[in-house]
A protein has these predicted regions:
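Hydrophobic alpha-helical segments, chiefly the membrane-spanning helices
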Residues: 243-245
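N-terminal Rossmann-like or analogous alpha/beta NTP/dinucleotide-binding catalytic cores
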Residues: 1-119, 205, 216-217, 221-234
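Active-site cores that bind ATP or allylic diphosphates and position pyrophosphate for catalysis
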Residues: 106-234, 240
Length: 245
């Protein structure tokens, strides 16, 4: 007998709950109820500059007003940064990441200068400027005090993955994994020791989430999350994704 499905609603307390948040919460709660599953509430508060305690208090009050219930305790990402650090360390050890010293201005300039910059669903992709730096070059720039982010080397991730990996989306059916769809995404920054892509993947795995509901705007992010999950968190399999329109 299979265990009950586990779903999560994971808002960021960067402002008051808006209608889209409320709809997403109600949708996820309804799916969990219909499937006889569990609903988790996770506070995604890794952006310490924008997230505020008063917004979290208001968010919880609004969810209570909507009549929603969830499993306890509530997981707050800011309290579990070590989990993300451990996941990132493992990816680093497996040579699936690299430091990127480019500023946003430099990236935009390189994209503008390229004859045919690679594009993904959300626009131009990072051109890979720092991907092929030597170890000595990277070490020298670090020792020189240059700020850097950590990016996923999606080409290496693709080679690590078995061909034909997929997941099921309830709206669009079987989805074949494309590890390079979003390019070399940022997994951690100097000011925030993780990123949305890394934190959400790690937390879903640790919390045993089996079904994910998300908006159309995040549909293609599933490729990034499955890439990180399959290469690092191989034991965790999310059954399916449901798009909340």
């Amino acid at each position: 007998m299979r265990n009950s499905p586990i779903l999560r609603f994971a808002p960021s307390p960067t402002g008051r709950l808006h209608l889209g948040n409320g709809f997403s919460a109600l949708y996820t709660f309804d799916v969990a109820r219909r499937l006889g599953g569990k609903l988790l509430l996770r506070i995604e508060d890794i952006d310490l500059d924008r997230c505020r305690p008063e917004y979290e208090v208001a968010l919880l009050a609004d969810l209570d007003w909507l009549g929603l219930t969830w499993e306890r305790p509530v997981r707050r990402q800011s309290e579990h940064m070590d989990d993300c650090a451990a996941a990132l360390a493992r990816l680093n050890e497996e040579k699936l990441t690299y430091p990127c010293f480019c500023t946003r201005k430099q990236i935009a300039s390189e994209i503008a200068a390229a004859a045919s910059a690679p594009h993904g669903p959300d626009g131009a992709l990072y051109p890979g400027t720092c991907r092929n730096l030597t170890d000595d070059e990277r070490q020298g720039r670090r020792e020189g005090g240059e700020a850097y982010a950590i990016r996923l080397d999606c080409a290496k991730a693709r080679k690590r993955l078995s061909p034909g990996l997929s997941w099921y989306d309830r709206s669009r059916g079987k989805q074949l994994l494309n590890a390079e769809l979003h390019g070399d995404v940022v997994l951690a920054r100097k000011d925030i020791r993780t990123s949305y892509h890394l934190a959400v993947t790690v937390d879903d795995a640790l919390q045993g989430v089996t079904r994910v509901t998300r908006g159309q705007d995040l549909f293609v992010s599933s490729h990034v999350h499955r890439s990180v999950s399959y290469t690092h968190l191989r034991a965790h399999e999310t059954d399916s994704y449901l798009v909340c329109r």
